Amino acid sequence: MPRKSVQEREKKRLRLINKYFLRRSLLRKCVVDLKVSSEERWNAVLKLQTLPRDSSPSRLRNRCGRTGRPHAFLRKFGLSRMKVREAAMKGEIPGLRKSSW
């Protein structure tokens, strides 16, 4: 398991992402929209820069649900590759089995 501080940091980032999601998406739409005047677009860029850095979804790291491992994460299962293999060998994942040919 990762350190407690790492887990809490990820939880905090997730809360901030959810809190600022709507505001951030509206500002991004304004920045991309060419119909809006350049001054308004520039103001939207400045407002976007004032939002907390951790409110950006790209700052969130996918982690294994059982071990907290950040690498070799499989989105489909929410687990790392080792835990997917263990679960598959135990038959805990329906429809998944070791290939053989």
From Swiss-Prot:
Entry keywords, A to Z: Ribonucleoprotein, Ribosomal protein, RNA-binding, rRNA-binding
GO terms under biological process: translation
Keyword Transcription regulation: no
GO MF assignments: rRNA binding; structural constituent of ribosome
Stretches of the chain forming a coiled coil according to its record: none
CC annotations in GO: cytoplasm; small ribosomal subunit
Source superkingdom: Bacteria
Function: Binds 16S rRNA, required for the assembly of 30S particles and may also be responsible for determining the conformation of the 16S rRNA at the A site.
Stated family: Belongs to the universal ribosomal protein uS14 family.
Subunit note: Part of the 30S ribosomal subunit. Contacts proteins S3 and S10.
HAMAP family per UniProt: Ribosomal_uS14_1
Stated name of the protein: Small ribosomal subunit protein uS14
